Amino acid sequence: MDGTRTVLDIKEYSDSEVQKNRVLTLEEWQGKWVTGKTIFHQEQGHQLLKKHLDAFLKGESGLKVFFPLCGKAVEMKWFADRGHSVVGVEISELGIREFFTEQNLSYSEEPIIEIPGAKVFKSSSGNISLYCCNIFDLPRTNIGKFDRIWDRGALVAVNPGDRKRYVDIMLSLTRKGFHYLLAVLSYDPTKHAGPPFFVSDAEVKRLFDSVCNIRCLEKVDALEERHKSWGIDYLVETLYLFTEK
């Protein structure tokens, strides 16, 4: 019956090319931190991650977990507190400093020799290292490989024209037996230019299907009052789990 339809039944916008030429510069991203326009930050952490944490971690301990475009994600502290080693990358030094301050963590900083002007910030406990640099420069560092990747607010923030390059870097960082958890957003991209950018199911398959098993864990209605200022009337968040083929 039509009366039982929800936003999750809305047919996904079919043209993933609408935003393909949209570009946000690194300076614009840094400006969002300076002006406090960081509504993408979730102070309580990500609810779908909490719900599917067991599927992600599989009961394993001592994992190495990567947070691309990490901002000041509180989940980094969650994983560190559970005995895992956390590495993140973020272009905003302000965002990184805010993370350590808000989590009451002491830290040190040192230059990244391979990337002029870049720094790495390390918690005094040694289990959180946050690289302040362009994520596309990351392959120049000896950052190692990861058991887990938590990609929330990263793929949807990367300029659409850079997605393939970004995904290639992410997959190059994975260890055998990896689990990669990805959250993406679906809405009408003719009504909102992004970021966050619209990422379709077909796009996810195009980017990951050749090397990953793809499992859709959940789709949820993510529309909040603040999103209506974007001009959209629906927003669906989809959580995917990728594993090694």
UniProtKB/Swiss-Prot annotation:
Pfam families: TPMT. Substrate binds at residue 40. The modification N6-acetyllysine is found at residue 58. It catalyses: S-adenosyl-L-methionine + a thiopurine = S-adenosyl-L-homocysteine + a thiopurine S-methylether. The keyword Phosphoprotein applies. One of its GO terms (molecular function) is thiopurine S-methyltransferase activity. Its EC number is 2.1.1.67. Its main location: cytoplasm. Keywords: Acetylation, Cytoplasm, Methyltransferase, Phosphoprotein, S-adenosyl-L-methionine, Transferase. One of its GO terms (cellular component) is cytoplasm. It is an enzyme of class 2 (transferase). Transmembrane segments: none annotated. GO terms for biological process: methylation. It is found in: Cytoplasm. SUPFAM superfamilies: S-adenosyl-L-methionine-dependent methyltransferases. The modification Phosphoserine is found at residue 14. S-adenosyl-L-methionine binds at residues 29-40, 69, 90, 152. Monomer. Belongs to the class I-like SAM-binding methyltransferase superfamily. TPMT family. This is Thiopurine S-methyltransferase. It comes from Equus caballus. The lineage of its organism: Eukaryota, Metazoa, Chordata, Craniata, Vertebrata.
